[in-house]
Regions:
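Transmembrane beta-strands of outer-membrane beta-barrel pores
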Residues: 30-34, 56-62, 80, 95-101, ...
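Outer-membrane beta-barrel proteins
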Residues: 46-48, 79-84, 136-141, 193-194
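Outer-membrane beta-barrel "beta-signal"
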Residues: 81, 180-194
Length: 194
């Protein structure tokens, strides 16, 4: 009872604060859309040169031939705008976290010390968390519409279990650790500003 009352109180306080906020925007990352990964972002202007972007995506599809590319990601980002919020150049400072279940991919690519070729005969299931910095630019198209491009680099820590195939349940290894350094964000966002 007290938890529900507290939660409702916080939601009502946040709702009353929204009209004070200069701008709110909804966005979708067209790069995720191209991979059939549903995604949504919300950005709120906090001050004349600062905003908070919270984006997330989920891919729950099992593909043909037993391949898996299931994952979810949450990525909050504080942004500093060089001119005004929602226009022009910005720097972003983001965190990221999520879970994944990948396997059955028959390509022999190694990229930034990641052994994607292992996914041909294995399935990796685990979680990750990290942080990074990004640079982006927003072009205003019309009163309510914008397009944004952003690239980020950073670090992610992941812990995962290894299975012998995309659908097998027997573990080959558990709690493996990997520290990734490289691109952590790539976006071409279509934005609607309220």
């Amino acid at each position: 009872m007290n938890f529900k009352f507290g939660l409702i109180s916080v939601i009502l306080m946040l709702m009353t604060a929204l009209p004070v906020v200069a701008q709110v925007a909804l966005k979708t990352n067209l790069l995720y859309d191209a991979t059939l990964t549903p995604n949504l972002g919300l950005e709120v202007g906090l001050a004349p040169k600062w905003s908070l972007d919270i984006s997330g995506n989920i891919n729950a599809w099992t593909l043909s031939d037993g391949r898996r590319w299931k994952h979810w990601l949450a990525q909050p980002e504080a942004r500093y705008w060089f001119c005004d919020c929602f226009s022009g150049h910005f720097l972003g400072f983001h965190a990221l976290g999520g879970q994944y279940n990948y396997g059955g991919w028959k390509h022999g690519v190694n990229f930034l010390n990641n052994r994607f070729k292992d996914l041909a005969n294995e399935r990796h299931q685990g979680w990750y968390a990290g942080a990074g910095v990004a640079y982006g630019y927003t072009w205003i198209l019309a009163k309510h519409w914008s397009v944004e491009a952003e690239l980020g680099i950073g670090w992610a820590y992941t812990r995962y279990d290894v299975y012998p195939c995309a659908h097998c349940g027997t573990k080959l290894a558990e709690k493996r650790v990997h520290n990734y350094v490289g691109p952590t964000k790539a976006a071409i966002n279509l934005i609607y500003v309220f």
